[in-house]
């Protein structure tokens, strides 16, 4: 943990599947932690590394890790008020604060998710439902994306039953932003 800031942001090493083989014996905590370090924590993307700037996960933020630990140990379910009124209250306070930060109306609603994939799934579901995209309207509906779109968007489309929409890919400008002229042209067609 002390070396996270200087650690590599990515390791291309492949997993050792034999480490995950199911068996009926026992392993000590130190053996399990070694497997975790060797096969989980040291391979692939290292979001807690000081060199990783791809997105903003929980990363190496100590207070965030302790919060996750506490919730996991006490097995809190903050998905509804009945099961964890305090956890739901914290979510509402944070959402109200975010509404103020972004000048959203007091009537705006939302939720805190585990990450961007679920956030995009919720947003696409909300858009589908708001515009009542169902049945024969699906194959006539158009979504505009760039080739730099996150892979979770295509997964979300499939999950919510919109895999048959028309997808128009837009060009990007020199700053990797969607080219507005390209968007306007595609919408006119």
Put a short name on every predicted segment:
Residues 1-107:
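N-terminal entrance/gating region of PLP-dependent enzymes' catalytic architecture
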Residues 35, 39, 93, 97-101, ...:
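Generic, well-ordered alpha-helical scaffold segments in large soluble proteins
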Residues 50-53, 114-115, 122, 175:
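Short glycine-rich loop/turn motifs that provide flexible caps or phosphate-binding loops at active sites
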Residues 59-63, 120-121, 155, 177-180:
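Short, solvent-exposed polar/charged micro-motifs at secondary-structure junctions
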Residues 74-82, 104-111, 137-140, 165-171:
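Glycine- and acidic
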Residues 83-87, 110-117, 145-147:
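Active-site nucleophile and cofactor-binding loops and adjacent substrate-binding regions
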Residues 91, 95-96, 107-136, 153-156:
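Conserved beta-loop-alpha segment that forms the PLP phosphate-binding cup at the N-terminus of a helix
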Residues 114, 137-141, 145-189:
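PLP-dependent aminotransferase-class I/II
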């Amino acid at each position: 943990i002390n070396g996270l800031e200087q650690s590599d942001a990515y390791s291309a090493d492949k997993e050792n599947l034999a480490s995950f083989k199911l068996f009926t014996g026992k392993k000590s905590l130190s053996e399990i932690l070694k497997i975790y370090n060797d096969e989980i924590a040291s391979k692939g993307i290292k979001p807690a590394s000081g060199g990783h700037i791809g997105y903003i996960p929980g990363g190496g933020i100590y207070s965030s890790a302790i919060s996750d630990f506490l919730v996991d140990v006490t097995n809190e379910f903050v998905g509804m008020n009945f099961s964890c009124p305090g956890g739901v209250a914290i979510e509402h306070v944070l959402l109200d604060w975010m509404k103020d930060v972004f000048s959203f109306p007091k009537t705006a609603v939302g939720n805190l998710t585990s990450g961007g994939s679920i956030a995009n799934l919720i947003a696409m579901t909300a858009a589908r439902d708001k515009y009542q995209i169902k049945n024969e309207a699906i194959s006539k509906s158009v979504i505009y994306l760039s080739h730099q779109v996150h892979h979770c968007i295509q997964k979300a489309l499939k999950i919510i039953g919109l895999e048959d929409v028309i997808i128009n890919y837009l060009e990007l400008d020199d700053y990797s932003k969607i080219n507005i002229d390209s968007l306007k042209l595609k919408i006119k067609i």
